[in-house]
Design a protein with these regions (language model features):
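Short, hydrophobic/aromatic beta-strand segments
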Residues: 59-63, 73, 183-187, 249, ...
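Asparagine-centered strand-capping/turn motif at beta-strand->loop junctions
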Residues: 288-296
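Short loop/turn motifs at secondary-structure boundaries
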Residues: 21-271, 279, 283-287, 363-365
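Terminal connector regions
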Residues: 377-412
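Bacterial N-terminal signal peptides that target proteins for export
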Residues: 1-8
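Intrinsically disordered, low-complexity Pro/Gly/Ser/Thr-rich segments with frequent PxxP/GP/PP motifs
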Residues: 337-377
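C-terminal motif of bacterial Sec signal peptides marking the signal peptidase cleavage site
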Residues: 17-19
Length: 414
């Protein structure tokens, strides 16, 4: 019994010594210098906060003004025990807040503390509820409190179809920046959190300077990228000044019929006949266009089956060039212009579907195209090559769709 009591006494003494020897949760806490002037002039702009954390805990760093209002610099940040001092620079900027009576058309995400005397508090709390707080004083003077305001934020059009069809292919975003900043960014965020950068039109106002700014977005399609999928997105404009203040404005944008258009003349083949004819005869072709993309292809007339005279072009039939439309063309050696004879890539209501007031070839579909040219004048030489092409007007004639399947044709006078 005496031995048992002695052992218990020794155990209790050991536990007491262990408890007494446990280090404080939070120690060696400093903030220096005690006076800062956060105005990006390079002098006393920041204070260094240092502390020793002896056990894992969540850390709060806050500032309280003379009226008892609290401003948050770090909020419940989890940190582990560390032999080295933790250190962080405080630039005078805290989580965004509004001044009494203030109403602004943007969200303030980071803001500098106004001039004044503040009580700083550094609090550590462990998972088992142990909490330690250290406090001190900080004076802020000559702070640059002017916000990098953004006003006049607009997104147009609100519904956007990046598919190079010439209809609502681009979005214009305008804003007015009220202060020179370190960074001005505009981006689109999808539901998965993927950010799509929107470039600025640098011809209007120098980057990051006060004034009117315009951003232009095509979904990346003009650079050969696949645009983001259809859906509703949030557009963000964010400005950050030299002090570190940030403001944010948002709007929504809906993508419809988005996709990179890809189409071909099927198998690179065209039927052309007759290959020998005389003046006043008619030369006719047949080919098939395949839409090999997940987007709709806009087209216009003249429609398949139309006949040209050889001294006409598509303008004569009342269908001028239109940016973004696909048309099949017929060309020949001595033509004075590129693909003077053109036809739509389908028939309205048969191969084509109507979207709004325009006609489109649906995704992953095919259409047979026919057309004729009546030869009404003698060309410069008897033997000529005729070939077909698939034109994406004001965009490109892809190499694979240019000079497709040339046929040698002889034209004679009667």
């Amino acid at each position: 019994m005496k031995i048992l009591r002695a052992c218990c006494g020794l155990l209790l003494a050991a536990l007491t010594l262990t408890a007494c020897g446990q280090k404080p949760l939070l120690e060696n806490v400093t903030l220096s210098p005690g006076v800062i002037s956060p105005n990006a002039d390079g002098k006393d702009d920041v204070a260094r906060i240092s502390f020793q954390l002896n056990r894992s805990a969540r850390i709060w760093i806050t500032f309280e003004d003379a009226l008892g209002r609290t401003y948050v610099f770090r909020n419940a940040t989890p940190l582990g025990r560390n032999e080295e001092l933790y250190s962080v620079l405080f630039p005078g900027v805290v989580e965004g807040f509004l001044l009494p009576g203030e109403d602004v058309p943007f969200r303030i995400t980071r803001r500098v503390l106004p001039d004044g005397v503040y009580t700083w508090k550094i609090t550590a709390t462990t998972d088992d509820g142990e909490t330690v707080t250290h406090t001190g004083a900080l004076t802020v003077e000559n702070a640059d409190t002017r916000l990098p305001e953004i006003t006049g934020f607009s997104v147009y059009p609100k519904e956007f179809s990046p598919n190079q069809d010439g209809i609502d292919d681009r979005v214009t975003i305008n804003l007015f920046l009220h202060k020179d900043v370190e960074e001005l960014t505009v981006y689109m965020l999808d539901k998965e959190g993927v950010r799509h950068h929107i470039p600025e039109d640098e011809r209007r106002t120098p980057l990051n300077t006060e004034g009117f700014h315009t951003f232009d977005y095509d979904g990346g399609i003009d650079a050969g990228a696949e645009p983001p999928p259809n859906g509703e997105y949030t557009v963000y404009a964010e400005a950050r000044d030299a002090v570190g203040q940030r403001v944010l404005v948002t709007d929504t944008l809906t993508l419809v019929n988005a996709g990179r258009p890809m189409a071909y003349i099927l198998n690179g083949e065209m039927t052309l006949k007759p290959t020998t004819l005389v003046i006043s005869d008619t030369l006719c072709f047949t080919l098939t266009v395949e839409n090999d993309s997940g987007t709709y292809l806009r087209t216009t007339g003249p429609w398949p089956g139309s006949t040209y005279r050889s001294d006409e072009n598509f303008n004569a039939l009342g269908y001028a060039e239109e940016s973004g439309v696909f048309r099949v063309g017929l060309d020949f050696d001595t033509s004075l212009r590129n693909y003077p004879f053109r036809w739509g890539i389908g028939r309205p209501g048969v191969d084509l579907v109507q979207i709004g007031k325009y006609w489109y070839l649906p995704p992953f579909s095919r259409s047979e195209i026919t057309g004729c040219v009546q030869i009404v004048e003698m060309p410069p030489r008897v033997s000529l090559y005729f070939w077909s092409g698939l034109i994406h007007e004001d965009v490109e004639i892809a190499a694979i769709n240019n000079r497709v399947d040339p046929h040698l044709v002889e034209i004679w006078e009667p």
